[in-house]
Curated annotation (Swiss-Prot):
It comes from Salmonella choleraesuis (strain SC-B67). The gene is fadA. Pathway: Lipid metabolism; fatty acid beta-oxidation. It is found in: Cytoplasm. GO terms for cellular component: cytoplasm. GO terms for molecular function: acetyl-CoA C-acyltransferase activity. This is 3-ketoacyl-CoA thiolase. Heterotetramer of two alpha chains (FadB) and two beta chains (FadA). PANTHER family: 3-KETOACYL-COA THIOLASE FADA, 3-KETOACYL-COA THIOLASE, PEROXISOMAL. Catalyzes the final step of fatty acid oxidation in which acetyl-CoA is released and the CoA ester of a fatty acid two carbons shorter is formed.
């Protein structure tokens, strides 16, 4: 079976969904920009030799509809002979895109794939056109479709206090801002055209979603966003609404050698699981455990974790049950996470994997694990190993 390696991994800056940098940019353009950038950064690879493009996107309607992967590839002037498919596993879409490409390469059905994902939550809101089947309530609690309430449930089951959530959210912003100031994100962000507050076209090379002024004290004044009577989850401890895309160049290790391209990491294992929709945010725990089992590793073997921060109330129970509470500051989301950067649904799996690989290189780490919860009760995880 072929070894699958990541040769390159990049992303756009994360733009605010409400009147942000990409308010006049379309999701297809953000995607095409990264496709072109990956090819330009790796000139020994010709676009015509790509076997397939796998692109994650959740709200596949309006500008994100009609197979956005193909639309973006055509905009990027990738040869018409290269196919492209849009993947949807809700929040885990672009990580699923990575898994799909990896399996094609492992089985020898492909050698080189472009992988990534996008979501423009400013143009296509998360709830746009959603119409749950009325009979679903016979099998699943109605609140299971309301992500904030599932986070409330997790916090109550695991004893996660409001103060713990506020502290974690403040940490996310502080670490993301520190990474921005130190230049840690420069290796992953591709400058991307957008418009500033005055409508002037400019290149953005930083995440505009981060709020460096965030403090625990300020967060403590916010009202509960989902359960106004007895809730603890606020807008400040939830992932920000943002627009963005991320992309990875994935290939067999043998093809990378032929092209003279240096692999940055290999995929050691992959896993996806289901869980109770009412505690959908718990998915990273069984997914991570399964991925670790497949890799022949334990949580203590992992040097760096990237865990998508859907909500502080959601990620803290996962950290707790993976036995990592005492190692948060050494191993978990060292450059902040989605609370600070946002969670553009179809983008986030590739985004956290990209950030993880860059962190592994900076820390000279051997193993890293990226994992996410998924709406309606799933979890997905990938173990990476430095080459």
């Amino acid at each position: 079976m072929e070894q699958v390696v990541i040769v390159d991994a990049i992303r756009t800056p994360m733009g605010r969904s409400k009147g942000g940098a990409f308010r006049n940019e379309r999701a297809e353009d953000l995607s095409a920009h990264l496709m072109r950038s990956l090819l330009a950064r790796n000139p020994s690879l010709t676009a015509a030799t790509l076997d397939d493009i796998y692109w994650g996107c959740v709200q596949q309607t309006l500008e994100q509809g009609f197979n956005i992967a193909r639309n973006a590839a055509l905009l990027a002037e990738i040869p018409h002979s290269v196919p492209a498919v849009t993947v949807n596993r809700l929040c885990g879409s672009s990580m699923q895109a990575l898994h799909d490409a990896a399996r094609m390469i492992m089985t020898g059905d492909a050698q080189v794939c472009l992988v990534g994902g996008v979501e423009h939550m400013g143009h296509v809101p998360m709830s746009h056109g959603v119409d749950f089947h009325p009979g679903l309530s016979r099998n699943v609690a109605k609140a299971a479709g309301m992500m904030g309430l599932t986070a409330e449930m997790l916090s109550r089951l695991h004893g996660i206090s409001r103060e713990m959530q506020d502290q974690f959210a403040a940490r996310s912003h502080a670490r993301a801002w520190a990474a921005t100031q130190s230049g840690a994100f420069k290796t992953e962000i591709i400058p991307t055209g957008g418009h500033d507050a005055d409508g002037v076209l400019k290149q953005f090379n930083y995440d505009e979603v981060i709020r460096p002024e965030t403090t625990v004290e300020a967060l403590s004044t916010l009202r509960p966003a989902f359960d106004p009577v007895s809730g603890t989850v606020t807008a400040g401890t939830s992932s920000a609404l943002s627009d963005g895309a991320a992309a990875m160049l994935v290939m067999s290790e043998s093809r990378a050698r032929e092209l003279g391209l240096k692999p940055r990491a290999r995929i050691r294992s992959m896993a996806v699981v289901g869980c109770d929709p009412s505690i959908m945010g718990y998915g990273p725990v069984p997914a991570s455990k399964l991925a670790l089992k497949k890799a022949g590793l334990s949580a203590s073997d992992i040097d760096v974790f990237e865990m998508n921060e859907a909500f502080a109330a959601q990620i803290l129970p996962c950290i707790k049950d993976l036995g990592l509470m005492e190692q948060i500051d050494e191993k978990i989301n060292l450059n902040g996470g989605a609370i600070a950067l946002g969670h553009p649904l179809g983008c986030s799996g590739a985004r956290i994997s990209t950030t993880l690989i860059n962190l592994m290189e900076r820390k000279d780490a051997q193993f890293g694990l990226a994992t996410m919860c998924i709406g309606l009760g799933q979890g997905i995880a990938t173990v990476f190993e430095r080459v």
